[in-house]
């Protein structure tokens, strides 16, 4: 009787892990407000802005 419940839980866990890995792959570039470094690029259309009193951040430049 317990096998179907266990199977459902395992499948649900696998789907959650797959979904989170997809999101992290999508977020591989720096989105607005994310810290950036010379090795980590910001997303398309964003630039890495060094700040005096903190880490560099990605931001959308004014047109």
Swiss-Prot record:
Residues 1-25 form the signal peptide. Keywords: Disulfide bond, Knottin, Secreted, Signal. The keyword Transmembrane helix does not apply. It is found in: Secreted. GO terms for cellular component: extracellular region. It comes from the Eukaryota. One of its GO terms (molecular function) is ion channel inhibitor activity. InterPro entries: Huwentoxin-1. This is Cysteine-rich venom protein 3. It comes from Pimpla hypochondriaca (Parasitoid wasp).
